[in-house]
Design a protein with these regions (language model features):
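Short acidic low-complexity segments
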Residues: 27-36, 197-207, 272
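Conserved acidic residues
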Residues: 35-38, 87, 129, 209-213
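Catalytic binding pocket for nucleotide-activated donors in carbohydrate/polymer assembly enzymes
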Residues: 219-296
């Protein structure tokens, strides 16, 4: 009897779409059930302890990881204990392979290309008239650390000053409740240069492509870089961190070993905002190497499916 080509997948903010489409195009089918004896493998975005039941339901079948976020999963450096039974972790770019090796991730890592949006050449701007600011968003349980709230507020204050001077418009694209982003008081000020827009972490890019400058953190910022839109990140020198409460909040353990490689070169919290914005909008030279390492090449669906099938 010919084996059935059925897989189980965890969905996360549409980040699974390219992987799922590649599998479907090669004759695989997604199981509609959490547990099924006919499933050949699982494809998940994370392996933290809260998802133990998901792995138990695999009944020993192989499983793989696709990227939970655009930034490589350096939280495995002391914040989260990785499971050791992952058949392979798929990553978007060379940085994912390098950093997982650097922190001693115990399972195989396979680069399959950037999957979250198209990769486009940089398009310079003369001015930053339209700025999209995407604050660091709270977890699903509404928790956001005090350090991230401070970063959000400081970045916002700097952008407002810049907007006042240059008559720019800042659209604050926030996820979940504004108070959980640490910006409730800022919203109450009703600044004339600021538009507040509640959004969803669904992979949409409209607020990126209509902007002259994007200021953000992690996935939204990485997508802006991929799309060729001038981008500043925020608090890049602060060690990566993880936690769903203050009690469980931790930083990575070996940040000094790889921070120079990982830090995005242009940060809104750098000393001279005017100079940093100008560098961001006029050329991609400062971030070209970073983009090659952290965005890399477009997603290769056949390479991904081949890698799955070779490991079953």
């Amino acid at each position: 009897m010919k084996s059935l080509k059925i897989f189980r997948m965890a969905h996360h903010q549409n980040k699974e779409n390219a992987f799922k489409s590649a599998l479907l195009s090669r004759g695989w089918h997604e199981s509609q059930y959490q547990a099924s004896q006919y499933v050949s493998f699982g494809l998940f975005d994370g392996d933290w302890p809260s998802r133990k039941s998901m792995f138990d339901q695999m009944n020993g079948k192989p499983w793989f990881l696709y990227p939970h976020a655009a930034r490589p999963m350096v939280q495995y450096d002391g914040c989260v204990e990785p499971r050791r039974d992952c058949r392979a972790m798929f990553v978007s770019a060379p940085a994912g392979v390098y950093l997982m090796e650097k922190i001693g991730y115990p399972c195989e890592v396979v680069e399959v290309g950037w999957s979250l949006c198209p990769i486009k050449r940089f398009f310079p701007r003369a001015t930053a008239d339209r700025i999209t600011f995407a604050p660091i968003h709270p977890n699903g349980n509404t928790f956001l650390s005090d350090v991230d709230k401070r970063l959000n507020l400081e970045a916002y204050r700097r952008l407002v000053k810049y907007a006042e001077k240059h008559e720019s418009t800042v659209t604050v694209r926030y996820v979940r409740d504004i108070k959980d982003n640490g910006l409730a008081e800022a919203m109450a000020e009703a600044h004339p240069n600021v538009i507040w827009k509640q959004a969803f972490p669904d992979g949409s890019t409209d607020d990126i492509t209509r902007a002259d400058l994007v200021v953000a953190h992690q996935t939204f910022a990485y997508m802006a870089v991929a799309l060729g839109v001038p981008t500043l990140m925020m608090g890049e020198d602060v060690p990566p961190r993880s936690g769903s409460s203050e009690a469980g909040f931790t930083y990575v353990q070996h940040w000094d070993d790889y921070k120079d490689y990982m830090i995005y070169p242009l940060d809104i919290l750098d000393e001279d905002v005017e100079e940093t914005v100008q560098m961001a909008i006029e050329s991609d030279e400062p971030i070209r190497d970073w983009k090659a390492n952290f965005i890399g090449q477009p997603f290769d669906g056949d390479r991904f499916v081949d890698a799955i099938e070779e490991r079953l």
